[in-house]
């Protein structure tokens, strides 16, 4: 009992100690105090149970203490029951975490303190990490070009030539001799303008810099160089890019990460703690004991740490929702950002390097997360460096130290308390009501520096970054830093296990098990794709079986070729069926690279499950095919031969999947992989022995037959069939019929060769999967470390490193400066527009409840995201839409802007008093989306000009339009990067903040009456945010209606708004009215609510407002802020205003435009062609690669079929079949390559098209026609390559008629394959489904082309498929024009002599007199597919919003 009293006293002391928590706002302190007292009361109740319960608990503890150490680590007491912490259920984990961390801000601190106190009580310390770096300099290679620095086809070719010549490249500095130190238990803030080198510094410290960068200097952890331990496992780098598997839920993502990162030193520490506790006779707190033991167990599928991280990151509410992507609805952008952070801190890393973790988060959520990080740093003695763009003052105050960077140099590195004194010593002072972080970033800017000059008696001169650096080195803080670094690290002060020496946290077996578990999960989530493939294969089996129906197939020489053709077709079909594996494998590569480089798992652990788990799928698909087609076609009816065929087909399908996975691992992008996959397919097929028999190959190329997996498959299948008893009839030559058929094809091998073939296929499968694992191991993520800059730009670089990179130049546009948000009076162009009010009443929005939520017990079929939202946005009024992450801000904007593609919308939305008509509303509104979707291959200036061209009315002449574009570019400060390529997010091109500013410019240039902006300042630093908001304010001042959702506004930015709509989680309004001077209206409204804490002096009103209206404050006060608002006079006034605005003003009329689009169709088409022309010219990965493919293909075909097209060289049916096979192969492979290449290219552009279509920029037909037309010049290049390489090498007739007929036919063929690829993308929701349907198209084309099964032999019930097959008309025109008029040349066919023309007509059914009709029909296919592409673009939208 004495021990119990001591424990109670200790808990009281802990509760009192918690009141000393640093830097917690008064509002949060009030909420936390209440929660803390509640928790204390609860624990006291637990302590005052009856003696029986106490004795029972003591007996259980005594029993646990008698267990061996390992068992004791796994056993604890939870809710008075002994439990195995490895087998805690989901409910138990959730209840325990809720009990430990009921209120995040206070209870998290309490939990960390209890853990630390428990360890200190027995003399155990956490290992710590100190990071030092000295004179670190990072340089990148750059390619200097004349003109604009863009990756055009020409620049790429020249760069490749220079690369081959190994000429040295220029170098640009990124970091310039930076030095510093990060200590344990310190939370450090990294500040600086975008492009100053913050990310590079974080990567350098985390040991994750690209190997192509030139790095000098030293980085040490606890005095050890990076190459003496594994920095990736000792520290964690948290990227600013959110890369996750879209099919996985939040919980699954975190569990997977926790499992692979392991528990680090937790297990050893826990073992030591419980050993010493046993020796000292100490009984720990049951909940703390359970928690600490649970997070110390390695390799668990479901981790307690996951539940804890989800709780403190605010992800518990979306735990069972999939992450999603641009085409799939998932968690919000803010939740995705928190998941990126949680994914790494769920591990045991002692040093954290965090890159812009607050992008997309509201200020209260950012404060909460940074507060938790502060607690982790201070209590757990972690070393944490965090880069933030716009930290609010209260968030800034949480940090201990500051690193301020500019131009790749460290301007200040030291205590936060000294930084203002340092700048005051330099002559600069931060004004009142100005955030310190905003001041620190702006005082370094040439444009903004002067306003902070405090020495009025002295003349101001711009203080350069170098001058600041010199001042810092001379300051006391700078000298202290030098002294600290001069003292060697004392290695006796830390445990040896602070640094990780193991690359992976789990055993090889556990790594494999975890990867298997994830692969199974992803296969379940993608079950639709695999089911579709099986159904497709079954359907094709039925079609094939009924084409080669056994009742039409005799066992004789004439029908032997059909049996041979059906076997070959089965092989082709199963090979082509593997194509969708390309899209699946490539789509997963970015996440794989991230996790591989974090040392989650090795490449082999990822590759083996991908291979093994696809084996059952291959077996199912092979059984489906064989069981349906085998007896329908009428192969040898012996059971053993059925299973022998099944085995070969199974191995071929497994090999196909392995091949395409291997190709994906080396090619990495969808476009390159498509070309690589088609090239591999081409080589395998050409050397496979069917299109060109082994005996017909040139002698010096016959070795190629033995390196093609298809050869062994063909040997196995044909031997299995033609060596059967029913083919033993003897022919006139004395050999059996079966042998004769095999000899004609060069496949005459003994029956035992079947098993050699099967073994060879197994060998190929293993080889390809080893190659896949090697590719995954050695290839770096896509993107390049080599910048492309212009010669003019490069000449401006200071060799001493004053300028940083092509996008780091600190030169500013010529705009007037005063207050950062003061209206810009100079040069403001105001184009004519109509001011409009948008009002909405009782708006509700419902979506179908996600399956994951229903599985967790949510009963309702519909999930309501907006609840009776009523409000209005008026001209000239700048309105802010705010709320915590997940409150429904973006949802409301989407609903008002008409961007939702699903769900149910209720309520009345009016524009100017008239019901909103989306088609006309799109003309007068702009929408800056959160996701920043742009065409990747055009420049910043071109993006803005393109938007202006299509969205400004025809009355605006081109000169005015160009001036307006220039002004918008300068206003948003895009002038320095106007020639930069936009690129793909996270891969290439613009940074996050540059991309955000481009989004705003693209919408502003449309001169809208109403403009919606979804988080326009998200991802921007304080200065860039001020620039953007000044531009937005200027727009509103011209009389436009402007609405912005905003997350982390500074006081200055927040008070630039006129009105505020505040929402709480669940989609309910809690405030809708004016801000007032210095936000007085908002402050007064909430301070009048009983219990709401008063705002402190100089505190950010937006942050205070979000804090006092959070869910925990509602729970503490026992109020519903939404209900209070509904009952307020403000709500009644707003309702009255909305009703008055819902009636049209006298003398006004509804919106009406004489045309649907701002520009005429001709102008739309002109603009679209202009953009597509630029995009294509700058897409070498698409156009150069497919041109290279055509070139190589032409050479390969030319060599293999050298002069076999010469009619004089054709003497029998095999010679004719060989050259016809050449035509068939040329057509098929060039066509498939075009189709496969265009699918990912169009897929990337599709989300841009959806945005532009919503904006009403152009008719979908204008875009479609431009897209279709833009392919023609590049197809012409392909045609010329075929005509001047393959045509003469193969030996086709050099007559004008035959030459131009061949050119016409190949042109139509290449175009219809291309347009089919475009069409299939526009008809399907994602690239995987598009690939499946494309592969079905290829296989049907194969079957119905008239080559494998000639038209006269196709059953009449399938002949319609033959006539609707584009490839059949291609071969018709090819065969007819080349050989259909050869009446003089006679050859031996099947034992008789016929003219070539007669054989073509009799065997294939191709008639020369019907050639014009065939030519016309052939030309109709590209036209048909192009029209269907246009229809799909105009009618379908697979985005889920």
Swiss-Prot record:
* InterPro entries referenced in this protein's UniProt entry, alphabetically: AAA+_ATPase, ABC2_TM, ABC_transporter-like_ATP-bd, ABCG_dom, ABCG_PDR_2, P-loop_NTPase, PDR_assoc
Q: Which residues of this UniProt protein bind ATP 1?
A: 192-199
TM stretches of this protein: 528-548, 566-586, 600-620, 642-662, 672-692, 758-778, 1187-1207, 1215-1235, 1272-1292, 1300-1320, 1329-1349, 1357-1377, 1413-1433
Residues reported to bind ATP 2: 883-890
Domain (ABC transmembrane type-2): give its ranges: 510-722, 1163-1379
* Gene3D superfamilies, sorted: P-loop containing nucleotide triphosphate hydrolases
Keywords of the record: ATP-binding, Membrane, Nucleotide-binding, Repeat, Transmembrane, Transmembrane helix, Transport
Keyword Signal annotated = no
Q: Where is the composition biased (Basic and acidic residues)?
A: 1-14
- Cellular localisation: Membrane
Q: ABC transporter domain location, by residue?
A: 159-432, 838-1090
Topology relative to the lipid bilayer, per the entry, is: Multi-pass membrane protein
First and last residue of the signal peptide = none
GO CC terms for this protein? Answer: plasma membrane
Per its UniProt record, what PANTHER family does this chain match?
A: ATP-BINDING CASSETTE TRANSPORTER
Please describe what this protein does. Answer: May be a general defense protein.
Query: What does the sequence similarity comment in the record state about its family?
Result: Belongs to the ABC transporter superfamily. ABCG family. PDR (TC 3.A.1.205) subfamily.
Name of the protein in question: ABC transporter G family member 41
Q: Which organism is it from?
A: Oryza sativa subsp. japonica (Rice)
